C-alpha cells in the first residue's frame, strides 16, 4: 500500500497526460482518476463512492453538499468515464446510477457498457486500444524483416482483461510469459497458443491455465504461492513479490504491456 501511495500522483499524472494527448482531436480532452483502496476494502464500493462524489460536482442543486462548489469554468461540465484497471465490469452501474441521480447525460456518462442493453461501443469487442498497439507491433516486425511466429513476447495484463485477451486473439507470436493479477506464467519454448486462446475467449486469468500443457521448462507461480522451486532450481519464496517484478526479469524480443504493473517500461528494460 505504501509503495502505491508514494507513486500514486506520478502514475496518475502520466496517465492523465497520455489520455489528454490521445484525445487531442475531441473537444472534451482527456484526464485520469485513480482510486487507492485501503487493504481489505471492497473495490466496487470504492468505485461507487467515487462516482457519487463526481456526480455531486456535476449535477446542479445536489442535496448533501456541505459547502459551495468552486466553479472556475462558469458553465456546466460533462465528464465521460471509461473503463480501466479493474473497473470494466462497473461501467453499467455508473450509467444506471447517473440516471437514478437525474443526470440528463447519464447514457454517455460511461463508455464500455453492455451494448445490447445500454448501447454504446463495447471496447473489448472492437479491440480499440489493442488494434492501435498491434499496428505499432506489425510496423516494428516488418521494419526488422522478422516473421511474427518466430518473435518471442512477454505480456503484462492477462487473458481476463480487454487488452490482454484481444492481444492474445490478434497475435501469432511465440508468447513466453504472461503476467496478470493472479501470477506469472512462463514457458521458454512458447506458451500453448490453444490454451491461451481458450482463456482469452472465456476471459479467465492464468490461474485457470492447464499446467499439463507447459513444457518441462515452463512454470506457473501464483501470487499466493510460497517456496516454489522453478525448473531452473531457483526458489520463489513469495509469489506476490515475484509477480510484481517478473516483467523486469524475463527476456524476450517484444514486451507488450496490456495493463498490469505501473511504470512497466523504464530505463532498466
For the regions a language model picked out, list residue spans one by one.
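Short acidic, glycine/serine/threonine-rich loops at helix termini
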Residues: 46, 89-96, 164-169, 187-193, ...
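Beta-sheet entry/capping signal
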Residues: 32-34, 77-79, 152-153, 174-177, ...
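Glycine-rich phosphate/diphosphate-binding loop of Rossmann-like nucleotide-binding domains
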Residues: 115-239
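Generic recognition of flexible, low-complexity loop/linker segments
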Residues: 22-25, 67-68, 140-144, 163-167, ...
Amino acid at each position: 500500500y505504501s509503495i502505491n501511495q508514494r507513486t500514486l500522483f506520478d502514475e496518475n499524472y502520466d496517465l492523465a497526460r497520455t489520455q489528454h494527448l490521445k484525445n487531442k482531436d475531441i473537444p472534451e480532452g482527456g484526464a485520469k482518476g485513480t482510486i487507492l483502496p485501503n487493504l481489505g476494502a471492497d473495490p466496487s464500493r470504492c468505485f461507487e463512492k467515487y462516482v457519487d462524489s463526481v456526480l455531486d460536482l456535476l449535477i446542479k442543486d445536489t442535496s448533501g453538499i456541505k459547502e459551495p462548489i468552486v466553479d472556475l469554468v462558469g458553465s456546466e461540465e460533462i465528464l465521460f468515464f471509461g473503463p480501466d484497471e479493474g473497473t470494466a465490469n462497473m461501467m453499467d452501474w455508473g450509467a444506471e446510477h447517473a440516471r437514478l441521480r437525474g443526470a440528463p447525460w447519464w447514457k454517455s456518462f460511461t463508455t464500455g457498457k453492455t451494448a445490447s442493453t445500454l448501447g454504446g461501443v463495447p471496447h473489448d469487442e472492437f479491440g480499440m486500444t489493442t488494434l492501435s498497439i498491434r499496428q505499432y507491433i506489425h510496423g516494428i516486425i516488418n521494419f526488422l524483416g522478422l516473421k511474427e511466429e518466430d518473435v518471442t513476447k512477454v505480456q503484462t495484463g492477462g487473458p481476463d482483461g480487454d487488452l490482454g485477451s484481444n492481444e492474445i486473439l490478434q497475435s501469432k507470436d511465440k508468447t513466453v510469459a504472461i503476467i496478470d493479477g493472479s501470477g506469472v506464467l512462463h514457458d521458454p519454448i512458447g506458451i500453448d497458443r490453444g490454451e491461451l486462446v481458450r482463456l482469452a475467449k472465456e476471459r479467465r486469468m492464468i490461474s485457470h491455465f492447464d499446467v499439463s500443457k507447459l513444457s518441462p521448462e515452463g512454470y506457473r507461480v501464483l501470487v499466493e504461492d510460497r517456496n516454489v522451486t522453478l525448473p531452473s532450481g531457483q526458489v520463489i519464496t513469495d509469489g506476490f513479490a515475484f509477480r510484481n517484478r517478473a516483467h523486469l526479469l524475463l527476456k524476450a524480443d517484444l514486451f507488450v504491456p496490456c495493463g498490469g504493473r505501473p511504470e512497466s517500461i523504464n530505463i532498466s528494460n
